[in-house]
Amino acid sequence: MKPTNILTYLDETATSYPDKPSFIGEASALTFLELKSNTEAIGSFIADKNIYNEPILVFMEKSPEEVSALLGVVRSGNFYVVLDLDMPEARLDAIIDITKAKLMIVDGHTKEKAKSLGFSGDICSYEEALSTQANDELLLDISHKAKETDTIYLVFTSGSTGVPKGVVASHRNVIDYIEGLGKVLECDENTVFGNQAPLYLDASLKDVYTTLKYGATTYFIPKKLFMSPVMLIEYLNEHKINTICFVSSALTIFTKLSAFDIAKPEYLKVVAFGGEVLPLSHLKQWMKACPGARFINLYGATECTGMSSYYVVYYVEKLENGIPIGKPLPDTEIFLIDEEGNIIANPHPSAEISSKDEESDHTVKQSAEMENLRHKGEICIGGTGLSSGYYKDEEITKAKFVNYQLTDGRSILLYKTGDIGYFGEDGELYFTGRGDNQIKHRGYRIELEEIEACGGAFEGVDRGCCIYNPEKEIITFFYEGRMEEGMVKENFRNRLASYMVPGKVVKLDKLPLMAGGKIDRKALSKLI
């Protein structure tokens, strides 16, 4: 039976594996029992301040201690919001303004920075919170009041207006996500994670909460090692790390610097990747270097608690159309809806779907004629992992989360991802690009990711990104690699329709990246 509170994982694991390491950083490590004790002390400290069901800011360096603080916030009946030194000051101030939090927990690395921010609440040190005597009676009372729909965290994503949006996630969202993901990754108490994602990103959930459920161990890989892939491989081998869930661009660092010519991961059993498309040329090199590992492509959105679908890669040679994003995780449903609101492909072929809201009243029907393979539509996700929306932003929540009524009697809430996809002849779901990266050029609709996928397959192109200038009507392909610009353009001419060939090709020493490792498209836009 599934728990209703995420802390049940920690409490049970601390009983089963009290002395086993849970999280290990550069300077410290915590056993499961130590982690549980820390959360009880920190939870009591916060609860003593009579703060309940409110956001608490945690501004610390990534470490086992930061995990203690996050879970301590949850133990107190509140929800956490992670701040990080990598965030620009304007973003930090925006999050502070949106949350109106009363308390911020800091450590020695962030204390001075915290004082310079526009925060009017209490700033307390991690050490002060940790020194509190656990109040068992108070914590028990809080746990009795807790509901599975209570918020556990806010993760802030970029907003189209430049103001970040806080995605709300509950205990039930995270529990159902971890229950399904753990089965896909085949986790158990012997799983050893190597964490890459910052804790302010939902991508870190795969490591943190799966560790709590299974009694696994997570190593926080030093950030500097991602600039030295051979040293990173040595780190993976030294600590016998057998499972990694990396953003795709992190995997390409190994291959573009030819790290596998010098060393190979010896213990990897699972290599999961997502966040952006992984070029097939890089996947082939990884599969050759780690022939005994399972490779899993994960797809999802922050608004759906991270990942919603998966595809296990067995034969990369057969992936002519790229890597599928596959099938839904348990307790998840995925629909494709076209521009007219019709379902293109549906796991419930006999269903009729109605969308009713204040703005519209239309009925969407599933029929055999609509099940047109490779007919593209917007990927819409439903299920228990679906967020309740954006924090204090009802307008955009209503726009992105749409309530549907199926004619079989079921009602379902769907998140409109803005991603475009299609169902292939193999029955798998394929991602082709963002709806907002779909352009109309010379009378044709073009998905920029389709051009990027083509360029990423060139031998000598490590990775690339397309930017479109609508005023000049020019597509620019920026890339890293050893292939010269003229040859890249010639390859495009040989492989793409003429209207899709980039008007400009620009070679860069290094593509600009965002904190999570994705390519920074806004930074590239400034170069055109």
What are these regions (language model features)?
Residues 1-154, 169, 176, 283, ...:
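AMP-binding/adenylate-forming domain of the ANL superfamily
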Residues 56, 73, 104, 151, ...:
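Conserved S/T- and glycine-rich ATP-binding loop of Class I adenylate-forming
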Residues 138-156, 163, 187-193, 199:
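Conserved pre-ATP/AMP-binding loop-to-beta segment of ANL
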Residues 213-216, 241-245, 255-324, 330-333, ...:
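Gly/Ser/Thr-rich phosphate-binding loop
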Residues 5-7, 104-117, 121-144, 174, ...:
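AMP-dependent adenylate-forming
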Residues 60-63, 84, 187, 197-204, ...:
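Conserved AMP-binding
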Residues 165-194, 202-242:
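Conserved AMP-binding/adenylation subdomain of ANL enzymes
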